[in-house]
Each structure stands twice: as C-alpha cells, then as structure tokens.
C-alpha cells in the first residue's frame, strides 16, 4: 500500500485527474490573488479551500470524487469572497448541502484508513452483514457531516464575533445550514460505494492481491477506457 506522500506525488492518469490537478493549481493561485486584493479573512478561507483540494489527492480518491470535492471547496471559498451567500437567497443552503456531504464522505475515508470504521466500499450490501455494514457507513457519514456542520457554524460565529461583523450569522441560518448539511451527508453516505470505489490506494491493493484479474474483456473500467476509475487499465478483482 503506498504512503500518503507517494500517493500525492504520483503522476495523474486520465483526463479527470488532470482536471482535478488543475483545480488544485487554481486554488493555490487563488490564495495569492486574495492576498493581494483582499484581507486576512479571505486568505484564511482560500487556504482552507486549498487544503480541501489537496486532501483527496493525498488519499488517492477516485478522480470523480476528487474533482467534485475540489470544485465544491474552491467554489464555496470564492462565493464567500464575493459575498454570494448574502446576495443570493438560498445559495448558502445549497453550498452546505453539497460541500458538507462531500466532506463527510472524505472524513469517512480518513476514518477507515485510520482503522476506526469499516470500509465504506462494502460491496453490494447483500446479506445481513452486508446490509449492516452499509447502514453503518451511512450513519457514520451523517454523524461526520453533522459534526462538520456544527464546527462550520461555530467558525462562522467566531468570525462574526472576533474578526468581522459582516460575516452573517443567525438562528434560522444556522438551523437551516445544519439541516442541509445533514441531508447532503445522508446522500453522500448512500453514494459511498460509488464515491470511493476504484480509488488509487484501493486499486493498488487489489492489483497486488492474489487472484486479481482484468476488469472487463475490453479493459474498460468504471470511468471509461483504460480499466479503472481514472483510466489506468490495472488489474482488479472480479466479485463472484
């Protein structure tokens, strides 16, 4: 199994991985841009977004998931810079629904790598044990999402109180954001097998395990030609 550093420094394969890396470059440049044209709050927001784009690559998440997290994190950060949350009614709720759910799924992957929870890529969920594992993964994702949403709201309150009173906070806003984040996390939990299936580290483990075979006679994988989620064409285990 490759280390986090090895996974992060590997060469991209497939169009989606190159696009996800381009998003990371844009995020890094965005930190420089806000450092010149905006203030400390905006710099902190874009640095958090940059971190959000880097973690999926360190974890070797499948390209689709990686790209979704990067675009959502960067979009949410720039939306804050341009104050879109207060200018567009309901926009804040949509961002919480999408980003909170994706981040909850990332946290579940981190927890699995640390050995705290079972694998979120738990197959088809058939049988009592499989169904229990699937339900458990969904519940853990929702729990992570609600916890992340709470920390998010606490951060907004701290920013409003200690840094800039222009940061919008309010009871209705907080409850609505937490509810949206919880629903997004529920959806992400249900989609975990798709989101984490075919990630780089998982493919490496499957490729090196006994009995691995080519996934499909034509070498196509879940994300198109080339075999796996990002077009590597590497061996994978057939589920029987």
Segments and roles (model prediction):
Residues 115-146:
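Internal alpha-helical transmembrane segments of multi-pass membrane proteins
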